Amino acid sequence: FSKQDSDISIQRVAFMCKLLARNGVAVFSAAISPSREAREKARKEIGSFVEVYVKCPLAVCVERDITGLYQKALKGDIQDFAGASDPFEEPLNAEVVVETDKETAEESANKIFQKLIELGYVSQTGAAGHVYSPEEEDKIKERLSRLGYI
């Protein structure tokens, strides 16, 4: 993608995240966003926003890449490839940074979950073992129905 294409894609993702969040849906979005400016615009658009920087050195990305796209980009066969033939601007103030070359997937997930607890987005105890009243169940079912899940 060109920088312009990438920025437009991030704008679309941000718009959808905003719509979902505005309607009470917890939204997780995984997007390659090489531009700090595009990420900041998304942050402003969405409002309630936690940036997770999944950090990985280029050499490790190349090693893990089963598609061969990084190699093609580094050879010049693919243009506009973020992090290889095009720059990737690292976030300056991401709420969470996971270093996938140093952490296990479980450690990274736990780091993200702990930050969400710290910021008040999720409860540490969760709802395990909670028994819902008939009224609570009705409210949950009504909401899921309105959202189109049931």
Stretch-by-stretch model annotation:
Residues 1-10:
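Flexible beta-alpha connector loops of hexameric P-loop NTPases
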Residues 2, 17-72, 80:
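ATP-dependent NMP and nucleoside kinases share a basic, alpha-helical "lid"
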Residues 133-150:
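Short acidic, low-complexity intrinsically disordered linear motifs used
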